[in-house]
From Swiss-Prot:
Protein name (Swiss-Prot/TrEMBL): Imidazole glycerol phosphate synthase subunit HisF
Enzyme class per UniProt: lyase
Amino-acid biosynthesis among keywords: yes
Record text on subunit structure and interactions: Heterodimer of HisH and HisF.
Matching Gene3D superfamilies: Aldolase class I
Catalytic activity: 5-[(5-phospho-1-deoxy-D-ribulos-1-ylimino)methylamino]-1-(5-phospho-beta-D-ribosyl)imidazole-4-carboxamide + L-glutamine = D-erythro-1-(imidazol-4-yl)glycerol 3-phosphate + 5-amino-1-(5-phospho-beta-D-ribosyl)imidazole-4-carboxamide + L-glutamate + H(+)
Lineage: Bacteria, Pseudomonadati, Pseudomonadota, Alphaproteobacteria, Rhodobacterales
Highest taxon listed in the record's lineage: Bacteria
């Protein structure tokens, strides 16, 4: 049985790690390369960098962060934020990313997922879905850092992009992000049940039990968290042991 992965997420703005609450009120949680090295040493299974201020002007900053991280870290690195084209994917893979995540660009043009998967393989193409609850059992995709409603159903979109070749879904509940109230489990379960690729649950982790629930109740293949790790509430080792004790297969440190 495949092991469940724990993935610390580093939101990067202007070359620094920040952690927002509901995508605002950013806090400085340090240098991304230092944080990545620390997480690698601590036993994280993968890392995720999201460039939340991605613009043409600061792309060079992010490429530098990715290159320096890849030089020091040996766990898989997923990079997203401002990824718009196959050439963006190529540039990030060459810089040292193992996987590249589309978000808004995949909503605007799902075929970009197919183009990237055809060139580089589904195993390195992730689609990040930011969803908000609109009514019980219904979730809508928002883009541009959660500011722009799309009218697109999250479950249907997940099925569309996996059919196009996405090898993984990074699912963030925007209602829960930064709240520490736990994952949106109905959303996570609905997406996990609807697709045949791994789903990474994101948004809302406040306790180690929340990580367990993302897998046992949400059906996720991996769990992503930021603030509980960034600010020292729990270590990766504690999280892995807690999940293992709950019967979840983990790569223990």
């Amino acid at each position: 049985m495949l092991k469940t992965r724990i993935i610390p997420c580093l939101d990067v703005a202007d070359g620094r790690v920040v952690k927002g609450v509901n995508f605002v009120d950013l806090r400085d949680a340090g240098d991304p390369v230092d944080a990545a090295i620390a997480y690698d040493a601590a036993g994280a299974d993968e890392l995720c960098f999201l460039d939340i201020t991605a613009t043409h002007e600061n792309r060079a900053t992010m490429f530098d962060v990715v290159t320096r991280t890849a030089e020091h870290c040996y766990i898989p690195l997923t990079v997203g934020g401002g990824v718009r084209s196959v050439s963006d994917v190529r540039a990030l893979l060459l810089a040292g990313a193992d996987k590249v995540s589309f978000n808004s660009a995949a909503v605007a043009n799902p075929d970009v997922v197919a183009q990237a998967a055809d060139q580089f393989g589904s195993q390195c193409i992730v689609v990040a879905i930011d969803a908000k609850t609109t009514s019980p059992g219904k979730w809508e995709i928002f883009t541009h850092g959660g500011r722009k409603p799309t009218g697109i159903d999250a479950v249907a979109f997940a099925q569309t992009v996996t059919a196009k070749g996405a090898g993984e879904i990074l699912l963030t509940s925007m209602d829960r992000d930064g709240t520490r109230a736990g994952f949106n489990l109905p959303l996570t379960r609905a997406i996990s049940d609807a697709v045949n690729v791994p789903v990474i649950a994101s948004g809302g982790v406040g306790t180690l039990d929340h990580l367990v629930e993302g897998v046992t109740k949400g059906g996720a293949s991996a769990v992503l968290a930021a603030s509980i790790f960034h600010f020292g509430d729990y270590t990766i080792a504690q999280a892995k042991q807690h999940m293992s004790d709950a019967g979840i297969p983990m790569r223990l440190i």
